A protein has these predicted regions:
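Short, structured coil segments at secondary-structure junctions
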Residues: 68-71
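Conserved acidic residues
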Residues: 52
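Glycine/Thr-rich phosphate-binding loops of Rossmann-like dinucleotide-binding domains
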Residues: 14, 63-64
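A short, aliphatic-rich alpha-helical micro-motif
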Residues: 47-49
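Short, polar loop motifs at secondary-structure junctions
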Residues: 41, 58-62
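Conserved active-site segments centered on acidic
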Residues: 2-41
Length: 96
């Protein structure tokens, strides 16, 4: 089971839509998810190590380097609402 977090700048509208997209992707790929959480980048930065995968906008990926060093897979997205991009990058991550 994977624990997934999705982050955007403010943690309100966009991260909720990202979470809904991620829900569709994991369902389509038949991935078992323990916890799926959406939040702001500041909350995400401090909580990232509690998750297996973090999705965030590509331009904020550097904020999560410490979490990556501790084993969290951080996936930056160019189009944060693209189901296809999220699915492709999830497959490329080696986590599934």
């Amino acid at each position: 089971m994977l624990n997934i977090m999705v982050c955007c700048a403010n943690g309100a509208g966009t991260s909720l839509m990202m979470k809904m997209t991620a829900d569709k992707v994991v369902k389509a790929l038949n991935i078992k998810v323990g916890k799926m959480h959406h939040c702001s980048l500041s909350e995400g930065k401090s909580a990232a190590t509690q998750y297996d995968i973090v999705f965030c906008p590509l331009n904020f990926i550097d904020m999560f380097r410490d979490a990556e060093k501790k084993g969290t897979r951080v996936i930056g997205l160019k189009n944060v609402l693209s189901k296809d991009e999220m699915e492709q990058k999830l497959k490329e991550s080696g986590m599934i």
